[in-house]
Amino acid sequence: MTKKYPKKRFINQVNYTTNRRRKDSTFCLLFGSEACKENALSLYNALSSVPCKAAEELTIYTLEDAVYIKRKNDVGYLVKNDLRLQLVEAQSTINPNMPLHGLIYFAETYSNYIITEEQNIYGSTLVKIPTPQYVVLYEGERDADAVQKLRISDSFEDRSVREEFEWTATVYNLCHKENRWLLDRCRILKEYTEFNERVRKYKKVMPIKKAVDLAVEECIEEGILAEFLKKHRAEVRMSAITEFNQEVYDRSLRQEGREEGIEKSFKLMALLHRDGRQDLADKIITDIELRKKLFEEYQL
């Protein structure tokens, strides 16, 4: 069963109305629908230390309009008998804000779970909630460690209180040889990465639409996601083209940001030398917090 929760906004979510037009990614089509429930079970078991024995025990959770402004690229699984809640995201970039994103997602999901199960969080009895697991599957082109732990405490303005609260996202680099075990445990995930690898390879030498079409044709011929691609060819084609175009757009924004940051840093160094603060001009090269503070001071 797939549970779709109604829209539930936080105070600062008024700008997220575009989410209603958000389309599912190839990843969600493959692992987040009732029609592909066995795929969901395989992925859940590959990532979980406590396996789920049957697809019927697995509930797929989706939030219709939570915290996203792009394409939905994640799926959530609840195994009710074991009270475990797993959120899995597929990403082509490593975003340091993923722990915050995951925290908001889980807060929404827990809120709806408590309502559905008619739990009383204001009573004297301890309310038990599903044990969370938050996983990010990275398959981008940038080199990255096999496994990374991203912590929400890195975002705290006051780092001295980080031990008081923590929320973690575990990032697996699917392109790293040390994570071949994960692909071996979930054949569909392995085939999904193979499809994406082909699209990436072909788009370097041909337009993205032709690259996607060629990857789809080859994978069908070679038995890679064959039945899925035959059935969902149009959706996958549109989704893949959009996703890879989004990657190009995101890279261009990051490049613009780097160039702007370099220009601002040079301006700041010139101003510091003008004001006789040469010692700070040397420090801002490595001290990010000092650089931010001085940007504000000089209104850059």
Name each model-derived stretch:
Residues 2-300:
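Elongated, amphipathic alpha-helical interaction scaffolds
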